[in-house]
C-alpha cells in the first residue's frame, strides 16, 4: 500500500459519514423499509459520492416509490402488469452464486428465445416498463436480504443468453428503441445492481447490435459487460458454484426448477383496444417539430385527483410531467413531478396513470429530441378517473394541436 493510500477502514468510515449525510437529508421522505446502509451507498456510488446530486436524485426516486407504493407488500404495488412480458419474456432469479456467504445474485435472461415481433405487438409501453420494474423490485428484495445476512454490499451477475436469436429487419429498431429505453429507465431507479452483465451464445452479427447500442451505454457500465467466448460454461463456473447454476449453463440445478419456459406469443395476446379506452380518433394530435418541444397545461382543482393519460406515438418522443401552484411560470420554475420518459413508437395505445397530490397546474412536456429533420405527432387525451370525463388542456386551441373527436353519447 502506498504511504498516503487510504486503508479499507478509512474508506469505510468515509462511506459511513457520507451515508449519514444523505440519510439525514432524505429522512422526511424515505420509508424505513428502504432505508439501509447499502441502498444509500448504491446511490452515492452511482453519483461519484456527490452528496447534493445524490440527495436530489434519491428524493425523486423515493417520491416515485411512494407514488407506486413500492415499499408496501408486493400485492399493494401500483405498478402495471404485463402478461405478455411476464409469461413470454421472463427474467429468472436463480439465487446467490455461492452455497454459503454468496454476495452475487445470479439472474438469467434468455433474450435470444423471445418472440420479439410478437412481444412488440402485444405490450403497451408503460406496462412493459412496469413489468421490468417488478422484476427489479424482486431482485432488490433478494439483494437486501443477502446484505442483511452477509453484512456486505451485494450485486448480481446478469446472464444474458442470446441462444436462438434470429436476425430480422426489425431487430435493430427494437434494440435501439424499446430495449435501450427500458434499460435506461431501469438504470435511473436501480443503481449499482449489476457486477457483471455476461453475454453468452452471441450470434455472428453481435458487432452490428453492439454498434447500435454502445453509444448509449455509459463507460462505467461498458466495463461491466462481458462477452463470453465459446468456453462460456467454464467462464461461468469461475464465478458461480456449480450447485448454484441451472444445468444448461453447466450447473446442477434442474432447468425445470429454476427456468421458466420462453414460448412464442399467441396472436390472441396481440394488443387490441379495450372497450373502456377512448378510440384513436378521440385523442388530440400534437405536432412537435424536430429538436423542439411542446407544453400542454392542465388545471387540477382537487387534491389526490387521479388522471389517466391515454397516448400513442409512432416515433420516439420524450415526455416529462411538471407541477406548479401557479399558471404563468417559466419552465425553470416548474417542479419536476415525473422525470423524463423516452417513449418508443409501438402499435398499442399507452396508458399512464398519475395521482395529482396537490391542486394546481400540471404541465406535460413533449420533446422531439430524437429527430433532427422530421416532426413527430403525439396523440393524447387525459381523463379524470373518478368522473370519467376528459380534462382538457387549457391551451387546446393552439394551432399545433388538432382536436380529437368528441365521444358519442350513448
UniProtKB/Swiss-Prot annotation:
SMART domains: SEC14 (SM00516). Residues 81-257 form the CRAL-TRIO domain. It comes from the Eukaryota. InterPro entries: CRAL-TRIO_dom, CRAL-TRIO_dom_sf, CRAL-TRIO_domain, CRAL/TRIO_N_dom_sf. This is CRAL-TRIO domain-containing protein F28H7.8. The lineage of its organism: Eukaryota, Metazoa, Ecdysozoa, Nematoda, Chromadorea.
